[in-house]
């Protein structure tokens, strides 16, 4: 019996990869959140009273349908994570890894149910007993609610089993069960044992998470600032997803009862309140970690920084960088994707980025102090309209333009002063940058709109790339020889920035079209290596 050992990765690389896997369920969460937000707001009594035509039965049926569809992602959140993690981490046979992830998570909960039944805790309908043991219905199974953290742990274990056994060779008599077929088999066995351990160790995990949540809550209005600043500071390293998931989906982001059910995590609480017909208004303790905190920086601050960079560019270069700044501005304000603007100053002035992180965190605190209650994930204009304006004055959405305008002025003044006082080389400040922009625009774009062959060559060619993946805005790569990577050539071909993590791992910041660039590059690599 033999098996192929998976390549070893450092802890840093592992957390990089783990954070990347969160993007698949988070992307669906964002879409479902908008569906739920529109459906619930337009079917609310207050909106119908204000706009009677919306009370039409056909329209109300559509809005109710939107709410139902939108609530899907939040009802099956742990399941999505336990599937997405093996899918994203697996190097080969990703479909098998995802399938095994679901099997492992379901079997783990069945084993927990077995333990609870064997101990005489189940079956019961006593609400006090269920609450005392944190028992919920998961996939129709009464089990201990381990939330997102339990799903993440299950996903990681299944991924490790997949990497260890997906190429296993069994004796001829058992050969049918070898290879990829063995992965869900071993996953069900191992996760069945893990499920027996969960009731013994989970109270310790729960206490730790609750303690973290208590610490954040005890910080009062300073807590959101710690979160907002921390997220920005971790973003260049791709580790912010871990912090965000912890606050959004675990007890660290708070725990409340909504419609008779105990719900944990800031985003989960907000979405539960959205879909609960008896809820009037949203929890300030939950929304203070969500979209509203980003809005001062995203809708005001970064546009102010972009205008400052435009005004500080040489007059003859302004028309050359206008497209770069406008595309970054649209990505930020409309899509909530800030890297295209942030990476324009991150590398030339790291101190400015730290100031930006602090001001972003301060925005979280200011929104919290003002009692704004706008939830969801992105902090963009869509969230502002759907979860702010459409839900009425009770969200205090009218405070957002006021604070955003102040942040616009503050950012503009700080950036203009810093750029001119310290002669920072932001886009358009010197002739070399201008020629690089011209060169990039003059390149031969492919289907992605980028000169992917030139980007691949700047990375040292297909033979130099060990692994290729992407997140929302960045290519994530492992290379054999970092000395073969030409950073300037990457920037000449419209890369916004390059983050070298260590001797073999780097990230190339592309922007919103990174998925198209990655797919085109993967196809090109396959052709070259075939």
Swiss-Prot record:
A single Gene Ontology MF term assigned here is:
D-glucose transmembrane transporter activity
Q: Keyword set for this entry?
A: Cell inner membrane, Cell membrane, Kinase, Membrane, Phosphotransferase system, Sugar transport, Transferase, Transmembrane, Transmembrane helix, Transport
Task: Please tell me whether the keyword Transferase is annotated for this protein.
Answer: yes
Q: Write down the species.
A: Escherichia coli (strain K12)
Q: Which GO terms describe its biological process?
A: carbohydrate utilization; D-glucose import; D-glucose transmembrane transport; maltose transport; phosphoenolpyruvate-dependent sugar phosphotransferase system
Q: Which residues form the active site?
A: 471
What reaction gets catalysed by this protein? D-maltose(out) + N(pros)-phospho-L-histidyl-[protein] = alpha-maltose 6'-phosphate(in) + L-histidyl-[protein]
For domains, the record's comment is: The EIIC domain type-1 forms the PTS system translocation channel and contains the specific substrate-binding site. The PTS EIIB type-1 domain is phosphorylated by phospho-EIIA on a cysteinyl residue. Then, it transfers the phosphoryl group to the sugar substrate concomitantly with the sugar uptake processed by the PTS EIIC type-1 domain.
Positions of the PTS EIIC type-1 domain: 1-431
Tell me its EC number(s), please.
Answer: 2.7.1.208
- For this entry, the protein name equals PTS system maltose-specific EIICB component
Membrane-traversing stretches: 22-42, 69-89, 96-116, 138-158, 189-209, 289-309, 321-341, 343-363, 369-389, 399-419
Against InterPro entries, the record matches this protein to: Glu_permease_IIB, PTrfase_EIIB_Cys, PTS_EIIC, PTS_EIIC_1, PTS_Glucose_EIICBA, PTS_IIB_1, PTS_Mal/Glc-sp_IIBC_component, PTS_maltose/Glc_sub_IIC
Q: Which GO terms describe its cellular component?
A: plasma membrane
What is the annotated role of this protein in its UniProt record? Answer: The phosphoenolpyruvate-dependent sugar phosphotransferase system (sugar PTS), a major carbohydrate active transport system, catalyzes the phosphorylation of incoming sugar substrates concomitantly with their translocation across the cell membrane. This system is involved in maltose transport. MalX can also recognize and transport glucose even though this sugar may not represent the natural substrate of the system.
Induction notes from the record: By maltose. Repressed by MalI.
């Amino acid at each position: 019996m033999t098996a192929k050992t998976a390549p070893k990765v450092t802890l840093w690389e592992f957390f990089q990869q783990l954070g990347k896997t969160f993007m698949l369920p988070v992307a669906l969460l964002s879409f479902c959140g908008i569906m739920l937000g529109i459906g619930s707001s337009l079917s609310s009594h207050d909106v119908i009273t204000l706009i009677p035509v919306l009370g039409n039965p056909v329209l109300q049926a559509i809005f109710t349908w939107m709410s139902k569809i939108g609530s899907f992602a939040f009802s099956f959140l742990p399941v999505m994570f336990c599937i997405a993690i093996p899918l994203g981490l697996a190097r080969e046979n990703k479909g098998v890894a995802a399938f095994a992830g679901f099997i492992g998570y379901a079997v783990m909960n069945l084993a927990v149910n077995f333990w609870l039944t064997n101990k005489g805790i189940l079956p019961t309908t006593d609400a006090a007993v269920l609450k005392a043991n944190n028992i919920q219905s998961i996939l129709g199974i009464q089990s201990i609610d381990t939330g997102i953290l339990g799903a993440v742990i299950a996903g990681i274990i299944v991924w490790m089993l997949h990497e260890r056994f997906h190429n296993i060779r069994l004796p001829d008599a058992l050969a049918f069960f070898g290879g990829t077929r063995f992965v869900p088999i071993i996953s069900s066995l191992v996760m069945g044992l893990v499920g027996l351990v969960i009731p013994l160790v989970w109270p310790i995990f729960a206490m730790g998470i609750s303690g973290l949540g208590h610490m954040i809550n005890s910080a009062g209005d300073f807590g959101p600032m710690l979160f907002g600043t921390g997220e920005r500071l971790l973003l260049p390293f791709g580790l912010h997803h871990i912090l965000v998931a912890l606050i959004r989906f675990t007890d660290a982001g708070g725990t409340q009862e909504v419609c008779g059910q105990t719900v944990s995590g800031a985003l989960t609480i907000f979405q539960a309140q959205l879909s609960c017909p008896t809820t009037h208004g949203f929890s300030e303790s939950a929304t203070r970690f969500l979209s509203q905190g980003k809005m001062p920086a995203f809708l005001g601050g970064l546009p102010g920084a972009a205008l400052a960079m435009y005004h500080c560019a040489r007059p003859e270069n302004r028309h050359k960088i206008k497209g770069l700044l406008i595309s970054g501005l649209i990505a930020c304000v409309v899509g909530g994707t800030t890297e295209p603007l942030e990476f324009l100053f991150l590398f030339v002035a790291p101190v400015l980025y730290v100031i930006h992180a602090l001001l972003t965190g301060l925005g979280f605190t200011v929104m919290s102090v003002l009692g704004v209650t706008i939830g969801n994930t992105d902090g963009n204009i869509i969230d502002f309209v759907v979860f702010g304006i459409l839900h009425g004055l009770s969200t205090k959405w009218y405070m957002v333009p006021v604070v955003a305008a102040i942040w616009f002025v503050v950012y503009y003044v700080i950036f203009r002063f810093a750029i001119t006082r310290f002669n920072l080389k932001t886009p358009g400040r010197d002739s070399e940058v201008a020629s690089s922009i011209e060169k990039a625009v003059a390149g031969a774009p492919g289907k992605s709109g980028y000169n992917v062959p030139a980007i691949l060559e700047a990375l040292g060619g297909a033979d130099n790339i060990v692994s290729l993946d992407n997140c929302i805005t960045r290519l994530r790569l492992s290379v054999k020889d970092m000395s073969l990577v030409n950073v300037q050539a990457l920037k000449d071909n419209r890369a916004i920035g390059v983050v070298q993590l260590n001797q073999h791992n780097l990230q190339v910041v592309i922007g919103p079209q990174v998925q198209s660039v990655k797919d085109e590059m993967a196809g090109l690599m396959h052709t070259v290596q075939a």
